[in-house]
């Protein structure tokens, strides 16, 4: 936790209706030490860390949640003063499709892949947030998918948004971890979650599986709050019911876990 406190994050308050409390009802997580930080007040966003005995993962080793993109005010200042628990993978550089977005890729203490990103101007076709503190909210969750067109259709139906077209973009960590030239273009697609909040779908590159390997550290789930239940047929009956909330465990194309939280109706 010291690494994230060094970025300026504070601890989040706990409640039985919190996303963390609901996610921790998973029997796999029973009794595991955990801690939750507040990433943003508006939109309200928390990040929960759970102690897990698996190995440190290789980026993009498996399909599913692969990285979080975190908004920062001054990327060069963070680069110059990155807490030592984070390992630099790529220094600040403009994205291949916009000079107004610069990102720095790092690995966190448990190998978690983070894109620290500065937005310096408008990007046509995107509604992007403005940082309110030096290291701020996660505004993009990156999802490695085995069939990008299938996942585009799925998320457009789930979120009730227009289905984007996949576009070629440089994803240097995905290329590097698969022995490709880092200028290689991969198919990616942004999916609008809410204003200033996105999913990025990255076409995954299959790797040989290792039989019997203990699951590594990684992302357990992503919780989102909505005003209504998910579209019919996209989740079974509520998996968890609290005094005020229903929680639906969304059945996704590649098994990436989404907990859909909504009020009782």
Question: Which ranges hold each PLM region?
Answer:
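Core segments of cupin and vicinal oxygen chelate
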Residues: 1-44, 94-97, 143-196
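A short, acidic/glycine-rich surface segment
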Residues: 19-24, 54-58, 122-127, 171-176, ...
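Generic structural signal for well-ordered beta-strand positions
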Residues: 112-114, 199, 256-259
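Short N-terminal edge-element motif at the start of the domain
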Residues: 83-96
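Vicinal oxygen chelate
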Residues: 1, 31-82, 102-107, 137-147, ...
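Surface-exposed beta-loop interaction hotspot
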Residues: 94-95, 100-154, 161-170
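Short beta->alpha transition motifs characteristic of CBS
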Residues: 117-123, 203, 260-265
